[in-house]
């Protein structure tokens, strides 16, 4: 018998197939007495997705209520690439690998809820983190009347021991390595992998090397640098070393190139939207190359005013994504401006990968605003008259000279 009386008849659960969401699946059935539909997204997390189907069937979910989708291309094309056009970095460092995945998962849950006639959705995010906000803001933006169940905010399973006991009571399979407290929690997709908690909670301690899963230790990377060329069209990468690739395949290739060269590690203390600071370890191998390369092609194709405006707006755009406002009108407004700026962001960037670093070492574009005749120090340059700089400087100095005169008057009056 369910312990909660509810008008919820069917719920769509974001289901990974892991222990926590399997416990949530059974908890939803026993607590709400509702039918559970599972949705598992393949975002390139690097794990087998199909076992989630078998796990759900084992736990009593009807086969027709199990949804598994390969979203890798959609994820990179419609979420990752638009974000990278903006040069988005939360607090100047974090490339938003977890944040950008949540809107797509939420969108698919709402679509499945409509398809199956479900009246609620559920997620496995904890009550302390940002993901609960990201999921639920997206749910409500897409379906204002949807009911949301957040088990971690409701249940009394407050310890690992209690979770294991619940799993055993309901015959949920438990891997041996899941019986003790996990040393850290992990989130992963094609863009990144992140680890938080336990061994990482003391920000004074160095991250143990075993935590890293997607990059070799930069100290162990090859002693010879790797050079790659990335082609861009309208701000998006389209080819590596002359080979055209789909969005997901391109990011996969960049991930591998970055992995062997130890590129993309970040040890970060960030300000969560819910108000606390947290320490996390992020690996964004291919994304780190992409960020550097995109800024490289923009450096020769964007006008100064447009480039500086983008840089002013990037923190706001990044914050919106981090906080869960992907579907907000202000994010969409900023996206339209950003996409307009990318019309001529096309060309080729050469990047050097070496022992943890990714550095632009060359860039070219048919739309380049870089004019060698203007900047050369050699004789014969005809497009620029050095004498013109005098008037430019005098005009820009006018307010500074006026302020200086006032300061001199004040100083003289104080001495009198």
From Swiss-Prot:
Homotetramer. Its EC number is 6.3.4.5. Disulfide bonds: none annotated. It catalyses: L-citrulline + L-aspartate + ATP = 2-(N(omega)-L-arginino)succinate + AMP + diphosphate + H(+). This is Argininosuccinate synthase. L-aspartate binds at residues 126, 130-131. InterPro entries: Arginosuc_syn_C (IPR048268), Arginosuc_syn_N (IPR048267), Arginosuc_synth (IPR001518), Arginosuc_synth_CS (IPR018223), Arginosuc_synth_type_1_subfam (IPR023434), AS_cat/multimer_dom_body (IPR024074), Rossmann-like_a/b/a_fold (IPR014729). Belongs to the argininosuccinate synthase family. Type 1 subfamily. It comes from the Bacteria. L-citrulline binds at residues 94, 99, 130, 134, 185, 194, 270, 282. It holds the Pfam family Arginosuc_syn_C. GO terms for biological process: argininosuccinate metabolic process; L-arginine biosynthetic process; urea cycle. It comes from Methylocella silvestris (strain DSM 15510 / CIP 108128 / LMG 27833 / NCIMB 13906 / BL2). It is found in: Cytoplasm. ATP binds at residues 14-22, 41, 124. The gene is argG. Gene3D superfamilies: Argininosuccinate synthetase, chain A, domain 2, HUPs, Single helix bin. GO terms for molecular function: argininosuccinate synthase activity; ATP binding. Its main location: cytoplasm. Pathway: Amino-acid biosynthesis; L-arginine biosynthesis; L-arginine from L-ornithine and carbamoyl phosphate: step 2/3. Keywords: Amino-acid biosynthesis, Arginine biosynthesis, ATP-binding, Cytoplasm, Ligase, Nucleotide-binding. GO terms for cellular component: cytoplasm.
């Amino acid at each position: 018998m369910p312990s909660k009386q509810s008008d919820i008849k069917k719920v769509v659960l974001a289901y990974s197939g892991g222990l926590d969401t399997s416990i949530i699946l059974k908890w939803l059935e026993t607590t709400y007495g509702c039918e559970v539909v599972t949705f598992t997204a393949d975002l390139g997390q690097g794990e087998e997705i199909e076992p989630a189907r078998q796990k759900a069937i084992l736990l009593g979910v009807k086969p027709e209520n199990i949804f598994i989708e390969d979203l890798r291309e959609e994820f990179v094309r419609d979420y990752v690439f638009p974000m990278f056009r903006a040069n988005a970095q939360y607090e100047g460092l974090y490339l938003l690998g977890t944040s950008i995945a949540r809107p797509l998962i939420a969108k698919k849950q709402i679509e499945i809820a409509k398809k199956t006639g479900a009246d609620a959705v559920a997620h496995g995010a904890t009550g302390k983190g940002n993901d609960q906000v990201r999921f639920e803001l997206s749910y409500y933006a897409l379906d204002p009347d949807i009911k949301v169940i957040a088990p971690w905010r409701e249940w009394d399973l407050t310890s690992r021991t209690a979770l294991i006991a619940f799993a055993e009571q309901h015959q949920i399979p438990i891997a041996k390595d899941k019986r003790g407290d996990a040393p850290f929690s992990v989130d992963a997709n094609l863009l990144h992998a992140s680890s938080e908690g336990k061994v990482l909670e003391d920000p004074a301690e160095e991250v143990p090397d075993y935590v890293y899963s997607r990059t070799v230790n930069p100290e162990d990377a090859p002693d010879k640098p790797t050079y790659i060329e990335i082609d861009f069209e309208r701000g998006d990468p389209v080819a590596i070393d002359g080979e055209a690739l789909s969005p997901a395949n391109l990011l996969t290739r960049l991930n591998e190139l970055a992995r062997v060269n130890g590129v993309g590690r970040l040890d970060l203390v960030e300000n969560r939207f819910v108000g606390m600071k947290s320490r996390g370890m992020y690996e964004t191998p291919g994304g780190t190359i992409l960020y550097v390369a995109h800024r490289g092609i923009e450096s020769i194709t964007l006008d100064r005013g447009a480039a500086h405006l983008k840089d002013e707006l990037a923190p706001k755009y990044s914050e919106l994504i981090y906080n869960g406002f992907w579907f907000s009108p202000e994010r969409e407004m900023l996206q339209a401006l950003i996409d307009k700026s990318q019309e001529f962001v096309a060309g080729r960037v050469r990047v050097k990968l070496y022992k943890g670093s990714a550095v632009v070492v060359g860039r070219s574009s048919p739309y380049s605003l870089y004019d060698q005749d203007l900047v050369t120090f050699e004789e014969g340059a005809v497009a620029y008259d050095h004498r013109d700089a005098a008037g430019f400087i005098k005009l820009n100095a006018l307010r500074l000279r006026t302020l200086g005169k006032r300061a001199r008057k004040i100083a003289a009056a104080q001495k009198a």
